C-alpha cells in the first residue's frame, strides 16, 4: 500500500469510526446545552481529567463536593440554601458532560492506534487525524478555561459568555472536520459546480458558523429569556440599550440587547441568502443541496422564533441547538459537494 492509498476495507472501518465519533460529539453538544440551561456548569469546581471520571461514591464524598460548590459565587448569590439533592442534580449534568468528553477521547485515541497498527492510514490522512485528536485535547482545555471563569475570585454567577462561545464553536469545528474526512473517504463524487455556487456555499457555511457563535452568546447571557416579543424587541425595532455605556464595545459580547438583536439580524440575512441561493442554483448539479439547506435554515428560523416567544424553555432550546448543528453539517456537505472533483485518490478501486 502506498502512503496516500487506503483500501476500501480500511476506508469503510475508518468511516464507521468517524460516524461513531460524530454521534458522540453531537451528544456532548446537546448534553452541554442541557448543562447550560440547568445552570449546572459550575457544579464541579476542579479539573481532574483522570480521577474525576469516578463520581462521589458515598455521602461523605458528596458533602465534600458540595462544600467546594458552596464556595462559588454562583451558590452564594443564586443558590444559597440549596439542598444536597438539588446539588446532585446539577452535578450529574456536568459530570455526564465531562464523561462523554472522556469517552470521545478514548474512542479517538484507541481507534487511531488500531488503524495505525493495521497500517490502514495513508500519510496524509494520518496527520489529519492527529490534528483532529489535537483539536479534541484543546477542546477539553478550553472547557476548563470556560468553567474557571465562574470559579474563584469572581463576581460571575455563570461562565463568561465569550468563553462559552469559543467552547461551542470549537465543538462545531471538530464535528465539521469529522464530517469532511468522512465525505473524503466515501465513494460519492464532488459535483464541480460553477464557481459562483462554490462561493455561495462557502459564504452560507461561514455565515452559519457566525450565527451559531452568536447564538452561543445569546445562550450564555440568557438573552433569549429577556426580550421575548417578535418581530420587535420590547416594542422597538432597534433596542434602546443596544450599547451599554459601562460596557462599551463589550456590549456586543456581554449585552443582552446587542447579542439578541445581532442574532436576529444574522438569522434574517441567512434566511434570505439561503432562499436566494436555492433559486439561483436551481439548474446546477447541486440544486438539491442548496434547496435542502434553505429548508433547514427556514425550519431553524421558525423554531428559533417559537423558542424565543416561549422564553427558551429547555425542550425547545435544545431542539433549536440540535437543529442548528444539523444545519451546520449540511452546509459543510454542500460546500464539499459543490467543490471540484477529487484530486487525490485515497480509495483504491475494487479489484
UniProtKB/Swiss-Prot annotation:
GO BP annotations listed: heme A biosynthetic process
Keyword Cell membrane: yes
PANTHER family: CYTOCHROME C OXIDASE ASSEMBLY PROTEIN COX15 (PTHR23289), CYTOCHROME C OXIDASE ASSEMBLY PROTEIN COX15 HOMOLOG (PTHR23289:SF2)
Cell compartment(s), UniProt: Cell membrane
This protein's name: Heme A synthase
Superkingdom field: Bacteria
Principal location: membrane
Pathway it works in: Porphyrin-containing compound metabolism; heme A biosynthesis; heme A from heme O: step 1/1
Assembly and binders: Interacts with CtaB.
Functional note: Catalyzes the conversion of heme O to heme A by two successive hydroxylations of the methyl group at C8. The first hydroxylation forms heme I, the second hydroxylation results in an unstable dihydroxymethyl group, which spontaneously dehydrates, resulting in the formyl group of heme A.
Pfam families for this protein: COX15-CtaA (PF02628)
Annotated gene: ctaA
GO-annotated molecular function: metal ion binding; oxidoreductase activity, acting on NAD(P)H, heme protein as acceptor
EC number: 1.17.99.9
Keyword annotations from UniProtKB, A to Z: Cell membrane, Heme biosynthesis, Iron, Membrane, Metal-binding, Oxidoreductase, Transmembrane, Transmembrane helix
UniProt membrane topology term: Multi-pass membrane protein
Catalytic activity entry: Fe(II)-heme o + 2 A + H2O = Fe(II)-heme a + 2 AH2
TM helices/strands, residue ranges: 17-37, 103-123, 129-149, 164-184, 201-221, 261-281, 289-309, 316-336
Cofactor field: heme b
Family, as annotated: Belongs to the COX15/CtaA family. Type 2 subfamily.
GO cellular component, one term: plasma membrane
